């Protein structure tokens, strides 16, 4: 059985927006993907926020209603699920984010890495930094 995938926000966004600079590598990954791919509440919110942000959308922000339709389009694909916050998530999140210095940019990445690990999923991203968490990653280029 193929391991399921957990794309980060930027992968979902690149898939959703044909004009995105990383749309082609995201689409190439998506077209070859046969396993389940999952959203978390954080990746859902991130996608909805980016789709409705003019600067992220080249001045052409979607309405909230349109953004919901894009998200719904992903969920209508039989490969897409919402992955639950499993009990293991909390301990993993604390371990990945428990640094001895203030590092505000670590919170979201640590959460995404923990969510992928707790759900035994491959974290799919454009960001090489996810490798530092020791979770299984697929870095798109």
For every predicted segment, state its role:
Residues 43-46, 66, 108:
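Short, conserved alpha-helical segments within structured domains
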Residues 134-141:
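Active-site regions of enzymes building and remodeling cell-envelope glycoconjugates
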């Amino acid at each position: 059985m193929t391991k399921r995938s957990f794309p980060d926000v930027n992968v979902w966004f690149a898939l959703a927006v044909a004009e995105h600079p990383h749309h082609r590598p995201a689409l190439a990954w998506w077209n070859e993907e046969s396993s389940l791919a999952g959203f978390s509440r954080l990746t859902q919110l991130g996608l909805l926020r980016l789709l409705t942000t003019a600067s992220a959308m080249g001045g052409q922000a979607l309405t909230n209603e349109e953004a919901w339709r894009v998200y719904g389009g992903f969920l209508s694909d039989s490969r897409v699920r919402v992955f639950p916050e499993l009990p293991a998530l909390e301990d993993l999140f604390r371990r990945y984010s428990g640094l001895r210095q203030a590092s505000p940019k670590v919170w979201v990445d640590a959460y995404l890495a923990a969510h992928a690990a707790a759900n035994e999923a491959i974290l799919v991203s454009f960001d090489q930094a996810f490798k530092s968490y020791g979770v299984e990653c697929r870095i798109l280029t």
